[in-house]
Amino acid sequence: MSEPSKEELLARIAQLELENEQLKQQNGKKSQHEQFNKIDDNFSLDEYKRYGRQMIVPQFGSLESQIKLKNSKVLVVGAGGLGSPALLYLSSAGIGKIGIIDPDTVDTSNLHRQVIHNTEMVGEFKCISAQNYINKLNPHVVVEVYPTALNNDNAFGIVSQYDLVLDCTDHPAVRYLINDVCVLLGKTIVSGSGLKSDGQLTVLNFANSGPCYRCFYPQPPSPDSVTSCSDGGVIGPAIGLVGVAMAVETIKIITGYYTKDNFVPFLASYSAYPQQQLRVFKMRKRQKDCAVCGENPQISQRMIEDGTINYKTFCGRATFDPIDDKFRVSPKDYDSVVQNKKKHILIDVRPREQFQITHLPNAINVQWDPTFRKADAIEQYLPDDSTKDDEIYVVCRFGNDSQLAAKKLIGMGYPNVRDIIGGLDKWSDDVDSKIPKY
């Protein structure tokens, strides 16, 4: 038997550390619960006091509804901008058990919007960070964590343990997976999404009779149209509002406020700019020809678990045609051009907002989208004394749009064009750490 590799040992150490942390959390939970003796079959005095202000709201449903919350088990997929506020309010409201699944770790760039995490938790799994916060917020809630990605292999085993699922992800492939698994298991989904200053939420497969995600979107969006928070940016409170609303819908479902008779499929849309606006649209009912919840379903648990349904293939990948390596230079190579004061032109194709955050000296800002991408000529943006034989270097944030721009310049007849590999992000790593990453 061969000796385990360094990578295998490190993975095993990480797993043992996670198991140790979970045991400590469980032991701490036991000691916390011992402090609260029940005064009846339902709650301790602390719980009556903790939840009293929501139990006296007529629409909530008094003690009966609070008991339903305590007996419920909710899975939250994603502990980011949507999942963070949803987790805070669901745990505060008294959900009995909350599962959190997220493979990512906390990064400093998350903290302006993912409010369940803090600076001390940077580098920690998001689900562990969220668990730590919830344990301090409400010791009556049991928290189960899954520091892994939801996939074809584990989805049914995890989702089957819960009554309801919150989809707080930002990946179309995972969104379709959650939908299909929940429909096949008869679970209701509270689904949210958000980007920049806009967000949406809806309730899917309500009581296993309402429309599902595939009823609304039989086909996924074009991969080229999908923008991440990293690329498009995000206003924290705008997305947080959607996460809070998801918690409200979850409470209404669990407490029985919604019934098959009064529930109407809807899509709620929130926009923060230019004026705050919240609109609710009535959506169509379950579709008879839906691939998973229709009269003749084409998707089964077996097909998902054996990989017949490949969600990444179904959703596709963004098409990207990289430029030939001979037209690319490293940040250090470009730095040599600058240090030697060699005549050249530097074009920065990032959006104006990003250019204003930081840029290299003497850079000319020509946004790739929509300006550069649609342009038939580029001369109007270049210095008056420039010629087509000048050396032109193109930079962006990560080195993707700059390749597209460089290729277009070559097609326009500029022979001496070079793309700066890795963009400003790589420049910060290799040349000047004072250039901020954002």
Swiss-Prot record:
InterPro entries on file: MOCS3/Uba4 (IPR028885), Rhodanese-like_dom (IPR001763), Rhodanese-like_dom_sf (IPR036873), ThiF/MoeB/HesA (IPR045886), ThiF_NAD_FAD-bd (IPR000594), Ubiquitin-activating_enz (IPR035985)
CDD domains: RHOD_ThiF, ThiF_MoeB_HesA_family
Organism: Candida albicans (strain SC5314 / ATCC MYA-2876)
Cofactor note: Binds 1 zinc ion per subunit.
Domain Rhodanese, chain residue ranges per copy: 340-436
Protein name as it appears in the record: Adenylyltransferase and sulfurtransferase UBA4
Cofactors: Zn(2+)
Class of enzymatic activity (EC top level): transferase
Subcellular location field: Cytoplasm, Cytosol
